[in-house]
Amino acid sequence: FLFFFLTVVFFQVSFGQNIEFIYELVYRPNVDDEKTNKEYFSLLYDTDQQQSYFKNITGLEENWASKNEIGFNTQVFKNFKENKFYLLDKVLSKFYKNDFKKINNWMITNDSKYILNHKTYQAKIASGGRNWVAWYSAEIPFADGPYKFNGLPGLIFEITDTENNYSFKLVQILKSNKNIILPNYTSLNDDDLKKLKKKTLENPSSNLMLAINQMKGNNMGFSVTFDNKNIDEKEMAEQLDKEIKEFNKTFNNPIEIGDVWLK
């Protein structure tokens, strides 16, 4: 990624189409290790509908490649017209929708600096058990930013927590013909989602075995291949349990302190 484009677009301003903001995230997945991971994200902003969609795009193009395992799978949808905001959390292969409120308790300071030739101003906030420092620019008049951060008088160019566990930086701005298309999801409130994550971590293969038993009940056949070998349902369950628990040992520093991190 050494030649990753730092593209600057000067808006003069007729926002008649969608705009895609590419962010680089550098974060510490493990609280007991200083090693960092690097991943890339798209914030697709629909200028007509005033809504946005944030998701991981690591590996989709050569410039967005990463040597580490992708760990940050949370997607975020924001609809500023209707004041609707929600996270789409991935638990195994399914997405679960969890609403959150618009962020409006920023503390704006007098500090400023230039980022990508745009003048930005500093703002601070406490969120998810962390203290964050953001840099935003009113030159791009969208009250949006990476992850669930929003509510400032301009686009967030950078935001980092004060312990340097997570750091988002805007690296590219693109005109886009893409449309916002959300994955299928199930709605859960915050408490129920946390319970589901904890239950899944305790026994990751339980839902898989339930689905297999349902297929058997419907006389549906199935086979699973792992490492080019056919494996039975018991081996499949053991492999899934091992994979999820090993992932959780490495990825134990979620962006929201106290959350359970699942792939």
What are these regions (language model features)?
Residues 1-21:
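Bacterial Sec-dependent N-terminal signal peptides
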Residues 7-9, 13, 65, 123-126, ...:
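A sequence-composition feature that detects small, non-aromatic residues
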Residues 12-19, 78-80, 142-153:
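Short, surface-exposed loop and linker segments with low hydrophobicity and enrichment for Pro/Ser/Thr
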Residues 15-115, 119, 132-133, 164-263:
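Extracellular or lumenal secretory-pathway regions
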Residues 113-115, 119-174:
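Glycine- and acidic-residue-rich phosphate-binding/metal-coordinating active-site segment common to enzymes
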